[in-house]
Structure formats: structure tokens, C-alpha cells
A protein has these predicted regions:
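Pyridoxal 5′-phosphate
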Residues: 1-273
Length: 273
């Protein structure tokens, strides 16, 4: 328990979580984290006449759960399109956000490496009354991350993409939102009391951590974060930009018109994907 709670605090500090003790939820992977938000938050807040907004850069884990929920709840799904160089086309963002309750957004595409303007989109989403669910799987391992500066309401990422073990994911969420959400899974560990006529869920974050936790994986994630912090995330980012620039330049010189590189042309506008 002590090791897991130390890891929770460490993860929280790494991403700038205001209240790590209650806002960091451990899952088995980022896919489960995003499903948790879709089912627990979306299930309680979305219905006929509502809408959510996704982008055409999203990983399936930030698309399919919303499709599954849409089949049950009957809300609308809208899409932010792409420009020719695989950036988000925000031309019609005000119209797309009208009446939207949630925005699903990747911080960095897992296909093209495109970095998205998270803070800009989040500010517009909040002005429209929507919460923002961030897929940070590619972002957290490669850039210094501060969820407060990004302004998002939920962020999901996984251990195996940041030098940690498989089988461990993270969901960060604003305490007030997590507190209002029903449990995602039921069983041991997530209950405060069980009687013949019902149960009372545990407090945060245990409410969302049913069953035996991934203890070894959580400790491994802690060690991975310590290592990344030792390297320095700004140094990691500089090195990756240099490698990306070298790769793009060398491939273009050698292959010329035979090669098409999808995504932003400048290395600073993309991750090392």
C-alpha cells in the first residue's frame, strides 16, 4: 500500500496534478482509462439531444467507447477534420462546439506525431460548456506535462509507452468530476459498505480501482518516472526533435519524390512518431 500510494503521488507530481491522492486513478492501460470516462462520466451525463466532439486524429480507444455509448444513449458525435498536413482544422470550431458536452482530444497523434493545440481547444470547449477528455499517451512520455496549464478535465496515459511495464495505465481527472461519477467496475476494494439492499462505494480514488491492483506494475511505473525525471523532459524533447529532424532530412535526401512524410513538415510541430 505504501509503495502504491508513493507511486500515486509521484505520477501526480510528474503531470502537475493538483490533488494526486484523490485525482490519480490506476487502471490496466490507457484504453481502460478512456473507457472509464466514457462509461462513468458519459453514461451519467449524455443522452438524446446531446453531442460530443472528437477529432479525426483520435486513437480507436478514444473513438470506440463513445460509439458504444452512443448506441445506448442516442447522442450525436461530431468530428474536427484535418488539414492537408494532418493538423486539426479549427476553422469551424465554434460551430462544432455549439451544444457539445464533451470533447475527446489527443495531445499527440499516434500515427503522424502531430501535436495539437490542447490549451486553445480546451479554452474554447470550456467556454462552450464542455469537458475535455485528453488522450495523453504519446504526449506524457515525450514532453513535460502540466495538466493545469493544459486546462483539460481528464487525461489518460499508459506505462509501457514511457519505459514502464505493460499492464498499468493512469487516469487523471478533476476531483469534483471524479467524485460525482458512479463506479466503473464493481467488486472488492471499491466499496465502503455492502448490505443486502445495496452498497456504498469507497472514496476516491479507490472507487475506481476494483479488485487486486497491479502492484508490481505500479512500482515499475514509479521507477520509470524517476528515470525520465533524471533525464529531464525538456532534454528528452530536444533530443527527439533533433532525431526527428535528422530522420526527415536524411530520408528526403535519399528517397526524394518516392517518399511521402505525413504530418507537419517542421519537426517542432510533431513528436518522434
Amino acid at each position: 500500500t505504501n509503495a502504491m500510494e508513493a507511486a500515486r503521488r509521484r505520477v501526480g507530481r510528474f503531470i502537475g496534478a493538483p490533488r494526486p491522492a484523490t485525482e490519480i486513478v490506476f487502471t490496466k492501460n490507457a484504453t481502460e482509462s478512456l473507457n472509464l470516462v466514457a462509461r462513468a462520466w458519459g453514461g451519467a451525463n449524455l443522452g438524446p439531444g446531446d453531442a460530443i466532439l472528437l477529432t479525426q486524429l483520435e486513437h480507436h480507444a478514444n473513438i470506440v467507447p463513445w460509439f458504444q455509448l452512443q448506441a445506448e444513449k442516442g447522442f450525436e458525435i461530431r468530428w474536427i477534420p484535418l488539414t492537408a498536413d494532418a493538423r486539426l482544422d479549427l476553422t469551424d470550431l465554434p460551430r462544432l462546439l455549439d451544444g457539445v458536452k464533451a470533447v475527446g482530444l489527443t495531445a499527440m497523434s499516434n500515427v503522424t506525431g502531430t501535436l495539437t493545440p490542447v490549451a486553445e481547444i480546451t479554452a474554447a470547449a470550456h467556454a462552450a460548456g464542455a469537458v475535455v477528455v485528453l488522450d495523453a499517451c504519446q504526449y506524457v512520455p515525450h514532453l513535460a506535462t502540466d495538466v493545469r496549464a493544459l486546462g483539460v478535465d481528464f487525461a489518460a496515459f499508459s506505462g509501457h509507452k514511457m519505459l514502464g511495464p505493460t499492464g498499468i495505465g493512469v487516469l487523471w481527472g478533476r476531483e469534483e468530476l471524479l467524485d460525482a461519477m458512479p463506479p466503473f467496475l464493481g467488486g472488492g476494494g471499491m466499496i465502503l459498505d455492502v448490505r443486502l439492499d445495496g452498497f456504498k462505494p469507497a472514496d476516491l480514488p479507490a472507487k475506481f480501482e476494483a479488485g487486486t491492483p497491479p502492484i508490481a506494475e505500479t512500482v515499475g511505473l514509479h521507477a520509470a518516472i524517476d528515470y525520465l525525471d533524471h533525464l529531464g523532459m525538456d532534454a528528452v524533447r530536444r533530443h527527439e526533435v533533433e532525431l526527428t529532424a535528422y530522420a526527415m532530412r536524411t530520408l528526403t535526401e535519399r528517397l526524394g519524390p518516392q517518399l511521402t512524410i505525413h504530418g507537419p513538415a517542421e519537426p517542432a510541430g510533431r513528436g518522434g512518431v
